[in-house]
């Protein structure tokens, strides 16, 4: 992969992270029920918001690990144990995101709100994306583990 392509992808990853962080910090202020609340009321009295912030940690870890993998690609270290570890972390975080979204879906279903369809639909979309990412990361992890093993065997033979 060209150096400019990996740098472009790393910039995209950083922009996605900044956009997600801005949304996490800005969205509670424009939500209807928090329009006239103080900062303390907005951020510390909503358990669902705290849950969303805790769940977002896994998302940001995935972004960081993806950034690291792209750095290894740029350095031509694709077939290394570091990439395998980063892919394993991405897989575990994607599974954690699935668990967090499932917990949020249960919370939405059990709450006494009138309109649950939007939240449930967003949860299904996020779960689908996380399943795809976890599956792809597991597949690439397995392929790279085998490639690293073959490479280490070839390095030992003279």
Model-based region annotation:
Residues 1-17:
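Alpha-helical transmembrane segments and their helix-start/interface "positive-inside/aromatic belt" motifs
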Residues 39-42, 116-125:
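Non-cytosolic membrane-interface motifs at loop->transmembrane helix junctions
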Residues 121-152:
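Alpha-helical transmembrane segments and their immediate juxtamembrane interface regions
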Residues 37-63:
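Membrane-helix boundary elements
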Residues 98-114:
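Alpha-helical transmembrane segments and their membrane-interface junctions
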Residues 61-81:
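Membrane-helix interface/capping segments
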Residues 78-89, 151-158:
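Membrane-cytosol interface motif
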Residues 18-31, 134:
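Alpha-helical transmembrane segments of multi-pass membrane proteins
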